[in-house]
Amino acid sequence: MTHNPTIVLTVRHPADSIAVLEVTGEIDVDSAPALRSSAMELIRQGAPHLVLDLAPVEFCDSSGLNTMIGILRYAKDRYGSLSLAGAPSHLARLLDITGVDHLIPTYPTAAEALARIVVPEGAPAETERP
């Protein structure tokens, strides 16, 4: 578990190559770097398919949205994926207004996001592209 003054990140691994990162608190200019770092480390360590469980998020600004897009790109570069789950109404509205929900799949719950993850056959065992 990682602590920052405005964010707590909790990780679980429901399956090989998949991680759920629960985000509690506020995603802002101060806490976004911790989220980015933790997500990218999970991907590097062999979980290229990542679900961000946003249900406990109290606040998110443009730094948080930018971080989510950066994580998506990082995951895709490593044959992975990013899904968002459980976004509270204030965050779901922000994702909709900005169009981020068209870039990153969003689901009502982490369980639904996990059910939609497809690990492609023939994907490299390693998470880094050559």
Residue ranges and their predicted role:
Residues 15-16, 55, 87, 111:
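Conserved catalytic submotifs in the C-terminal HATPase_c
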